[in-house]
Amino acid sequence: MDCTNLQFESILNLLKTDVSDNTFLTITAKIEIFSLAAESITADKILSFAKLLPIHNYHFNFIKNHMVFYILNYSTLGFAKRFSIAETLCRELKIFHRTFQSTSKLQNLNNAEVLYQFEKLIESIQVFKAELASPIGKLLRQETMIYDKPTEKSVKYVIIQQNLIKINNLIQDCESIKNCRLIAELIDELYQKVYRWFMQIFTYDDIIFPNDNFLDRLLKMDFCYTYYTASNQHLLSLFEQTIDNQIFIDPSPYFEINPVYSPELQFMSTFSLKIFSKNISAKNEDLYIYPLLKTNFSILTFLSLENIFFHHGFIYHILHRTNITPTEEKKLGKINGFLNTVIQQVLIKKNNLQITFPELLDKIYHLHRIGLNIETAQIFLQMLTTYKPATTNNKLQTFFTNFSIIIFSAYIFFLCIELFSPTFIFHNKKKLILEKQKSIILILGEQFSFIWKEVNEIVDLLFSSTVTETYFKFYSKGADDYEKDFLYKDLMEKWGELFFPLTYSMTTPQKYTDKHVSSTVLKNLCDTAYQSKMETAYESLLPYITHPEFKFIFITHYVRPSLSLITNLTFEEIKDNRRLLILIFACKLLMPSNYLLSHYLLLLHAFTLQIFKVDLGHFSIIHAITQKIFDNINSLTQTIFIPKTNFLVSLLLTAYTVHMQTYVNPWIQKTISENIALLKEYIDFTKKCSSTLATTCYLNLENFAVNMYFGKNKVGSTSLSAFYRTCSKLIEESKLFKDRLQEIKVSKTLFIEMLQNVVKNITKFKDLVSNQTLQNFIIIVERISSHANTTYQDVLNSIDECHFSNMQLIQSFKNIVYVIDVLNTKNIFNFSLASQLIEAKKLVKKQDTYNQLNVQDDFVTVLKSHLNNLFEKQKPTINIERRFMLEGIPDIKQIPFLDVFDERYRLIPQIEKYLHWYIAYSEAAQADLVEPLLLKLG
């Protein structure tokens, strides 16, 4: 029998040869664990099964008189053609109900009532599916609407609300059967269809506000077209029109006109291309160089505060600031106020009432309006996972905290809303999502512990759903104590927890043998059943379950050895081993009152069977389940059970391997690639600096050319203006490299912390750390961490050496640029030649000297190529002769470039005697200047 998909025909075949109570008990246990395939159920098969059921003992009478409920409660629709299968089953159940008489005191779970609700649900879903398939998208997005925009949006809103009200009414109409597995599957699929429908009708008009300015509107158009293309095709023309209508004289306030490489600028590179190409569908294929949208605080002049999440580069910029100016701090204070408003008004639930589906969908609108969906939340998550807080500024710290809470909450919200339904199916999925995200967030570092606490509370309250005691009283109305116990245990197994006790007294109908055996004999029987190769050997213990010591002996001699064997298997081995399955059957059959143990064993089996890719969330849940199993056993036996660790260790190592492959490895590959690219650039920059350091440069005063030599060999020539430009360029590159090289140090810190966090989190599992395999894994991770630290440090040491060498040249270049700037025409005009010469001379005199780089002959060719690529070649010029009193042209002396202030430039002694006539009042000067004018006038 296939335990994952029970066929009704196979069940009936087993009953052809044996219809004993024990056989029925085993079969019903398997049905309740694995469920029947709904497509295999017919009225005739149900009728045959019901007629064979014993009237008394166990819960057989309940099944017989509530067959419709039992079938819906323990059958599954599978994964294909679900609604069609449900319709067919409804018809078969109607036929069965007409042909089989039953008696029931349960007001809400009798065959007639359950069938009525099931029929009504099927009919409602048929109508609702037709409405969802209506062309609402086309209706509301026609190019020639007869409505104005506000009316159009209100019509759309009314249609959405009408449909959401219908689905709420639909669920209320099937309140008493919504916890049946088959019904829950139908509801779950319906809600997911509604969610997809809702997302397909999302448009730009839903998030635009009257006070949005030019940049706000373009960013929102880009958001809508990028993530909701099908419903926003009209933006292809609107985007272009919006740009054409903007008076765009000077783009510099918006854009970095000559951008240099920066991660924050790259976030908006595609968007910038779309603006300059006026094409919202443009793709960035690195074919063009164009200005990039600014990412610093100045962009807030054009970007509304509530739209900052649309600008990913700006968020990145804030996260990576370590200090801010007073003006920026004031702006950041307003941003923090906005973030706090988002947390309080959008994310936190206002009251204790269970949130409705329309309210959850409304939160999608609010998150979209500020630029958040699951894709953008992932982009921001990536920023946070590679971010290390390095600021003591309170406002920057507040921004990090609030931003993290919003992003993690929004991301998990979108993960949940995609799967949401008011059923136990979603409730269990939500627990898995939260555990998985908790594991991922906490491994990022201690700074996220408080953040996770807030996020967990927000999400848990948004999607809170459970079975209340009031609902259970309604659900079980008319049931006797035994039936209430059966229904309570069923809900417990589905929801995993019920927050109210079952307080009813139990008088369980029994039919047991009169056999009486000693405790020693019972121990031997349990040992024999455990060691037997027959899967159903445990059934031989059924006659002894009334023995006063049965529970203790059965757990000690059957359950504990079975768990020791199971926990000694690896995760892969346990999937192929049936021992866990046999243990579940045995516990459910022999200890029916201890439903918690059966429930946790069943959960353990479900997770090990259904999980194909283990992650930290799965491990966290399975680890918690195993601890509850062990705690339950310890509580029942008042002993301490110490399980084997192979199963959990293999699961943990698999989970961490997946975590590292999913999160750490891609980050390492991306970071190393970026670091290598950066190092290559810096090496090239260092080669340029080294080549220049190896030269002796002379200024030719005749044509203002700078001639460069390696020793006595001339290797190049460039104009003074080109030399000046190159000096300035290298100085700017040096500044940029100083900031960019910090990324390597940050990468080192982040990488080492990632590995250390892995070790730190593993060692938290005190019950597993003694396992040798786990110890070996920890040693390997620590070795990787040590090796990475050494490698990074070697690279950083090399960078420091290059930096020391490069800065000698850069400092000289700074002085050269300063001297040239001091002596430029503008400064001489403003401050006089004398003062500027004195200033330049002071600088030259205090210039420190350094040893010139000695170059071996075989390196000259190599260095020359770098030098030629660095400096523009001197263009041919007309030789300008100096005007001397002597005949002929004297030899032009080449003077070292840095030695421009030699004797020839020494100031003339008592220069004021020669200049006094124009810098001070003199009668002689006045007479010389005015006399010719007076003569002409006369």
From Swiss-Prot:
Residues 457-938 are annotated as: Interaction with large tegument protein. The gene is U30. Plays an essential role in cytoplasmic secondary envelopment during viral egress. Interacts with the capsid via the large tegument protein/LTP and participates in its transport to the host trans-Golgi network (TGN) where secondary envelopment occurs. Modulates tegumentation and capsid accumulation at the viral assembly complex. Interacts (via C-terminus) with the large tegument protein/LTP (via N-terminus). The lineage of its organism: Viruses, Duplodnaviria, Heunggongvirae, Peploviricota, Herviviricetes. This is Inner tegument protein. GO terms for cellular component: host cell Golgi apparatus; host cell nucleus; viral tegument. HAMAP family: HSV_ITP. It comes from the Viruses. Its main location: virion. The keyword Ribosomal protein does not apply. Belongs to the herpesviridae inner tegument protein family. GO terms for biological process: virion assembly. InterPro entries: Herpes_U30, HSV_ITP. It is found in: Virion tegument; Host cytoplasm; Host nucleus; Host Golgi apparatus, Host trans-Golgi network. Keywords: Host cytoplasm, Host Golgi apparatus, Host nucleus, Virion, Virion tegument.
